[in-house]
Amino acid sequence: MKHIHIIDSHTGGEPTRVVVSGFPALGGGTMAERLAVLAREHDRYRAACILEPRGSDVLVGALLCEPVSAGAAAGVIFFNNAGYLGMCGHGTIGLVRTLHHMGRIGPGVHRIETPVGDVEATLHDDLSVSVRNVLAYRHAKDVVVDVPGHGAVTGDVAWGGNWFFLVSDHGQRVAGENVAALAAYASAVRAALERAGVTGRDGAPIDHIELFADDPEYDSRSFVLCPGHAYDRSPCGTGTSAKLACLAADGKLAAGVTWRQASVIGSVFSASYAAAEGGVVPTIRGSAHLSAEATLVIEDDDPFGWGIAS
């Protein structure tokens, strides 16, 4: 029988499951090296935590790791139902809030090691969290793909910690009651990108699709299709970072100016950026709330103990 200690939270409605203990040892390498070990040798632990019957498609896991550097508060490896994530904005906010709950950190600035580099997270006195992300940049502008049933769709390819295709002119209604249609449209766009061979840098697959719309109260409202078939309930930290990179490249948002990004369900992140060589360094601010603390149990004779493959 296996036991995995977890603490759940949600950031703007998007859940994060922090794995505190119970995973196999991954060695003392970087977070990228440990991710490779986890994916290659112990992927069933990811599946057990995230897939049904213990998880769901919308859940993001965050394996809490000892950092390489003594100056870092923690290391983390993010994963979901489809595999592994280089970085996760909402997940980092959830992780920092969880570390505070565990008594590991107090308000202040903390460095978090991720597989794509270190991020700086500030826990504020009101327990909201600001995340200074990795470098974000636009890789390609005005990329056109033919989407069956929808015709030509134009968008930008950008990196914000994950690869995104960002579309503003899509003709879809970005609203909570329309998520089924939005997911179908975004899935069709992602499939069209794959057929056309459109990728991120060095052939990296584009696994996130982000649709933007005007919002009467905030700067924008977005729908984000994550890897697999789930959509982001939060405004998506890495997606907002990619959006800032595109706005900066187009001269539509100056450094230091706040951009307020709403999600499809109405939760909000505040974001700004600092100019940097080759792109921008975004800072995303949001809040997470604790929702559960539990021990997952995997019985030896459970036929679905290691998850139900979808």
Swiss-Prot record:
Family assignment from sequence similarity: Belongs to the proline racemase family.
Additional facts recorded: This enzyme does not require pyridoxal phosphate (PLP) as a cofactor.
Substrates-to-products reaction catalysed: trans-4-hydroxy-L-proline = cis-4-hydroxy-D-proline
Domain of life, source organism: Bacteria
Regulation: Inhibited by iodoacetate, iodoacetamide and by high amounts (10 mM) of pyrrole-2-carboxylic acid (PYC). Not inhibited by PYC at 1 mM.
Signal peptide (UniProt feature, chain positions): none
Species assigned in the record: Burkholderia pseudomallei (strain K96243)
Binding of substrate, residues: G89, H90, H208, D232, G237, T238
EC number: 5.1.1.8
NCBIfam families per the UniProt record, alphabetical: PRK13970.1 (NF010577)
One GO molecular-function entry: 4-hydroxyproline epimerase activity
Function: Allows intracellular utilization of 4-hydroxyproline, one of the major constituents of host collagen, by converting 4-hydroxy-L-proline to 4-hydroxy-D-proline, which can be further metabolized by intracellular 4-hydroxy-D-proline oxidases.
InterPro entries: Pro_racemase_fam
Alphabetic keyword roster: Isomerase
UniProt entry tagged with the keyword Isomerase: yes
Subunit description: Homodimer.
Pfam family of the protein (one): Pro_racemase
Catalytic site positions: C88 (proton acceptor), C236 (proton donor)
Identification of the protein by name: 4-hydroxyproline epimerase
Keyword Isomerase: yes
